[in-house]
């Protein structure tokens, strides 16, 4: 078996290749906006009162209290960005999230695409769906707008690239956010360009993580450079091999204990991702380390306790993992002690950064 270093150096070579190499065979990129009849477990029953008592951090939002256990067909608007190599789906009505992305050469979903909108009471305001890439801006995740409509705009750029911009206002912090989802006409990768602005005269809470999902399979190996991982409270632990000689970078060796949060640190690198060794496909993320240093892996526990959430969040697409990229090294969590505390967003400050998401194949 290849060493952990050998594995991620090979992934780095692929990232570098994607970053400098362009392909063009004259085929046009295609942008489609369509309404689909989509299998949906809906949500509703809004509390008529804002969140005065149960969670003051999300005031003035209210909470949704009703979640369907019967599936219906409901209209869902999708924005499809497609070139010769990949297809990216965006759903403005569900937090503006990237719903999924597929490598057209082999059908690999390098961003997990859920074939059902199964809303469950997980986010700060309640409704949340698994899969895709969730854009979190504000006080803490999963932010209040992750299950409700955002503004959006689509464009075909003069150079032939495709653009879908999503965004909105986080009412608790009064900050404004935008994400440009760009599919170049001649690359097997897409880009997200984020802009976040604090228009107020006071400090606001600062929390940003881009939460992507991938399929959870026994042959999945994570390429996450580092030699330690941080807990939510800031405690450093060994990575990837723990004191019991379990290689935590192998999904199947996480078959112990509760669900896992690994904030991996200790290497100055711009990329991370994962690879499925049996079918030689995978997924990757690139972002400048000085812009987005956080790299987190979230795994539901591999026992039936995690399987319950698979049943709650999808019908046929199986369990997923999350690979998250963040502006900070570790996610603040209420109740944890220092050194991890809530970061602040200075008055009238604007932050911008760029990330690239791409499929991987045949590098095993």
Residue ranges and their predicted role:
Residues 35-40, 79-82, 88, 94-100, ...:
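A contiguous, surface-exposed recognition patch within enzymatic or periplasmic domains that forms
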Residues 47-74, 78-82, 130-188, 218-219, ...:
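Extended, loop-rich substrate-binding clefts of extracytoplasmic carbohydrate-active enzymes
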Residues 105-124:
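Active-site-surrounding "flap" and adjacent substrate/cofactor-binding loops of secreted or lumenal enzymes
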Residues 124-135, 139, 231-243:
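Core domains of carbohydrate- and sulfate-ester-processing enzymes
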Residues 168, 194-196, 349-362:
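Short, hydrophobic/aromatic-enriched beta-strand segments in well-ordered soluble domains
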Residues 1-28:
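Bacterial Sec-dependent N-terminal signal peptides
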Residues 27-43:
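Short N-terminal segments immediately surrounding and downstream of signal-peptide cleavage
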Residues 93-107, 170-172, 360-363:
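Short, surface-exposed, low-complexity cationic segments
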